[in-house]
Amino acid sequence: MISFDDFAPAPGVPIYLQILRYIQRGAAAGRIQNGDELPSRRVLSALLGVNPNTVQKAYRLLEETGLVCSHTGAKSYMVLNDETVRAIRQELLESEVRALVTAMRQTGAGKEDAMGLMEKLWDECGV
């Protein structure tokens, strides 16, 4: 079962989107695999202290994108393959890098400064 033990809500971002992104990031990083079971909507809402409709909204979006298979009254499972995981990873990275580039340009940083900082932090933040 997918664990939400390290889920940390951020202020200013709707919780349903944070749940969606948490699952997408887990899939992109390989922590969430094809066939992994998601907690029930009721269990996850109690765990996170949010309204069950919030969890339902996140799960519905995951179902609409084909990442989750659910049946009424049954468990929900991840539906992932290599191509899907690559697409998720690409989408997440593009979104994050786009926000970073926008912020750097707004502070007046040039491309060379940005790339230099990226190289420095890449080495420092080795995971």
Model-derived segments and spans:
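Short, hydrophobic-biased segments on the C-terminal half of alpha helices
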Residues: 23, 59-60
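A surface-exposed regulatory interaction patch that couples sensing to output
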Residues: 79-98
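A short alpha-helical element within helix-turn-helix/winged-helix DNA-binding domains
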Residues: 37-48, 62
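Short, Lys/Arg-rich nucleic-acid/phosphate-binding segment
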Residues: 37-38, 70-78, 82-83
